Amino acid sequence: MVPVIALVGRPNVGKSTMFNRLTKTRDAIVGDLSGLTRDRQYGDASWQGRSFILIDTGGITGDEVGMDEKMAEQSLMAIEEADYVLFLVDARAGMTAADQMIAEHLRKRNKAAILVANKIDNIDPDVARAEFSPMGMGNAIPVAGSQGRGISALMEAVLGHLPRDAEDEALEQDVAEGEEAVRIPGPSEKDGIKIAIIGRPNVGKSTLVNRMLGEERVVVYDEPGTTRDSIYIPFERDGDKYTFIDTAGVRKRGKIHEEVEKFSVVKTLQAIKDANVVIFVMDAREGVVDHDLNLLGFALEAGRAIVIALNKWDGMEPGERAYVKTELERRLFFVDFADIHFISALHGTGVGNLYKSVQAAFQSAVTRWPTSRLTQILEDAVSEHQPPMVNGRRIKLRYAHLGGANPPLIVIHGNQTDSIPKSYSRYLENTYRRVLKLVGTPIRIEYKGGENPYEGKKNTLTDRQVNKKRRLMSHHKKAEKKRRDKR
């Protein structure tokens, strides 16, 4: 399971700056899932190959009223969700009553936490540590978040206390085996294809899970655990193994009450990270809403294969259906590679077809292609549509090979690759998708510039070459002397 780290502290101590630095912005979830998470913002981050989910919270002052009180409540909820807490304080302002209140809350909850003294620019780190030592949170780690100073030491201290995710361990093993190692995930003997069922509350996730498991199978799970535990449900269908990752929990069909279904962002994000394929469930009667786009965006950033299920399609008028299809085409253009199914989880209409799309998306996401095949596709694409000129020189793309899977990563080598425009990258992506007949999975293309293997190396001659050079020089001198003597 991917660990969760929460950033907490008073307002303006640098939590958002730290969040942006660790998520590198492009890895952060687009938006803050407004309406579901209030002021909590969730991001997918990594440090030296270790993945984790980061939560940015609103500030806590201890004297909140009205909306500020609700924001503080959300910050305290983030503490409960997290495996580890980064408690940020302002080294310039010194210790405050609000800092002491937060420290007391962390102690009462027996929460694993580390004290971070931020904004140490032009401040002696030892003085900063001494300032906050009365809080009883241990030695503060000094950082300057805006400049990135001290971040490495902080993250090494934090990640040393967190469990390793299975995917991270596999990637580290690849690195140990060599730079060119490529991990191609496949269905494990035990779990089969792991499918995450995600979506907003009340769209019918639990109804769909029970329907896909089979009418005759009634599953009851009442296991103790934290609020962010997901339910893993292994099963077989037509000889194929699967594992559902159900963020809503699985209940008896007669006891499913969609209106009280809990929604946890953390559970959803962790389920996406742990899955091979995501089935994204939407309510056809509500159409496409911003929350749907946010969740789909995270699944896309995580590189997971995607199947879209538009639930509650039954009973809709033809005009309503036509409008919804138009909206899907307009707003879901960024996942146009995903199969869309119009279903009724309650009545079972169209549900069986989901398995075919899951299988196709998974196979597209994990299939191996030899370097010769990927290079031939590249050469054909370049022949049909040349890359643009840069400073009077044509960009040259030499060969391509597979760099990873789930999602497929195609590494293209050439020169001036830093100057390749996004439009040409989209052209190559679409070409690979069309030729390889890929469905349901995003594709990532990575460029590597051509490097001169002799750059920076001295031209050292062998003994034989040195002797030959001497003979040639001696012969040249004798010939030159003869020419001068004849004159």
Curated annotation (Swiss-Prot):
Residues 3-166, 193-366 form the EngA-type G domain. GO terms for molecular function: GTP binding; ribosome binding. The keyword Cell division does not apply. Residues 467-487 have a biased composition (Basic residues). Residues 448-487 are annotated as: Disordered. GTP 2 binds at residues 199-206, 246-250, 311-314. GO terms for biological process: ribosome biogenesis. Keywords: GTP-binding, Nucleotide-binding, Repeat, Ribosome biogenesis. The keyword GTP-binding applies. Pfam families: KH_dom-like, MMR_HSR1. GTP 1 binds at residues 9-16, 56-60, 118-121. Residues 448-461 have a biased composition (Basic and acidic residues). InterPro entries: G_ENGA, GTP-bd, GTPase_Der, KH_dom-like, KH_dom-like_a/b, P-loop_NTPase, Small_GTP-bd. Residues 367-451 form the KH-like domain. Belongs to the TRAFAC class TrmE-Era-EngA-EngB-Septin-like GTPase superfamily. EngA (Der) GTPase family. GTPase that plays an essential role in the late steps of ribosome biogenesis. Associates with the 50S ribosomal subunit. This is GTPase Der. It comes from Pseudomonas putida (strain ATCC 700007 / DSM 6899 / JCM 31910 / BCRC 17059 / LMG 24140 / F1). The lineage of its organism: Bacteria, Pseudomonadati, Pseudomonadota, Gammaproteobacteria, Pseudomonadales.
